């Protein structure tokens, strides 16, 4: 695999530590072009920006982190080269879509956009000042931004919405919000997912019960036609599948791909329960 940021034709020697242009002259002057120097300077500034982001995760929004994540991947990996995550992997889908949207964007452009975004996040950032390295100074593959996005990010309390509280299984907050009519129990996010979808995806059985008691639409479908039953089945939460069925969930509803809930699970026990229930309704 070509070494990033080296001019065309440059390779690493057998020792891995010396550059070779393909001849035995050992003359490196050809590499000292203005273009090569500019690329090297940009790469160094990019690495400093990536290190600085480690301290900005708490103040950056989800959208800003995704923006940075996509450009980091474009620089380090290149064009998006992995399959789209499964429908129930919300976080993975968002990251994949952000990266995929960059298309054939060059590493140079991605680095410039990344650096500009960091400067916008922290106008007072001085690249000449070395970053302090703590226990998190080395974050492994992907760098600071990628690492933070591969885990549930910490969201400031004032920035949380009802779906964040649902993800956290904060039953008390959600119950109060619904009863005070601050939120509609059937409100959906940008993907058409209702609170019930989220609760089923995360395996929060008690929250599912609360939402059903608050008259959540049990057969509500998201933008891909999937119901809460699809989510519970796909995530193999058999107890939630049974709870939904007992509460009137329809196992005959298909998603946009034509799949029944029993067809999106890898668990034979869950699939069998759904098949038997569907047969009983026939």
Swiss-Prot record:
Phosphoserine sites (modified residues): 41, 106
Localization per record: Cytoplasm; Nucleus
UniProt superkingdom: Eukaryota
ACB domain boundaries: 42-127
GO cellular component, one term: nucleus
SMART domains membership: ANK (SM00248)
Covalent S-S links between cysteines: none
Keywords for this protein: ANK repeat, Cytoplasm, Lipid-binding, Nucleus, Phosphoprotein, Repeat
Sequence positions that bind an acyl-CoA: 69-73, 95, 114
Gene3D superfamilies cross-referenced by the UniProt entry: 1.20.80.10, Ankyrin repeat-containing domain
UniProt keyword Cytoplasm, yes or no: yes
ANK repeats: 191-220, 224-253
GO molecular function term, any single one: lipid binding
Signal peptide bounds: none
Major site of localization recorded for this protein: cytoplasm
Chain spans, region Disordered: 1-34
Subunit text: Monomer.
PANTHER family per record: ACYL-COA-BINDING DOMAIN-CONTAINING PROTEIN 6 (PTHR24119:SF0)
Role: Binds long-chain acyl-coenzyme A molecules with a strong preference for unsaturated C18:1-CoA, lower affinity for unsaturated C20:4-CoA, and very weak affinity for saturated C16:0-CoA. Does not bind fatty acids. Plays a role in protein N-myristoylation.
Protein name: Acyl-CoA-binding domain-containing protein 6
Source organism (scientific name): Rattus norvegicus (Rat)
């Amino acid at each position: 695999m070509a070494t990033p940021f080296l001019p065309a034709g440059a390779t690493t020697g057998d020792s891995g530590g010396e550059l070779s242009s393909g001849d035995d002259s050992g003359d490196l002057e050809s590499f000292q072009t203005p273009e090569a120097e500019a690329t090297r300077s940009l790469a160094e500034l990019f690495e400093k920006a990536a290190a600085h982001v480690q301290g900005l995760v708490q103040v950056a929004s989800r959208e800003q982190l995704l923006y940075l994540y996509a450009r980091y991947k474009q620089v380090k990996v290149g064009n998006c080269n992995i399959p789209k995550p499964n429908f129930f992997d919300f976080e993975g889908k968002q990251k994949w879509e952000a990266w995929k949207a960059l298309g054939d964007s060059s590493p140079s452009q991605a680095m410039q956009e990344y650096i500009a975004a960091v400067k916008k996040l922290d106008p007072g950032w001085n690249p000449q000042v070395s970053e302090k390295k703590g226990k998190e100074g080395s974050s492994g593959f992907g760098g600071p931004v990628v690492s933070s996005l591969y885990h549930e990010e910490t969201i400031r309390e004032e920035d949380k919405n009802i779906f964040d509280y649902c993800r956290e299984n904060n039953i008390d907050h959600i119950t109060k919000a619904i009863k005070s009519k601050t939120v509609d129990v059937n409100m959906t996010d940008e993907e058409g997912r209702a609170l019930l979808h989220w609760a089923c995806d995360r395996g929060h059985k008690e929250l599912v019960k609360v939402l059903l008691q608050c008259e959540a639409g049990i057969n509500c479908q998201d933008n891909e036609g999937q119901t809460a039953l699809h989510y519970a089945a796909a995530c193999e939460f058999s107890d939630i599948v049974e709870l939904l069925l007992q509460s009137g969930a329809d196992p005959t509803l298909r998603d946009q791909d034509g799949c029944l809930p029993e067809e999106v699970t890898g668990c034979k026990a869950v699939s069998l329960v759904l098949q038997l229930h569907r047969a009983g309704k026939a």
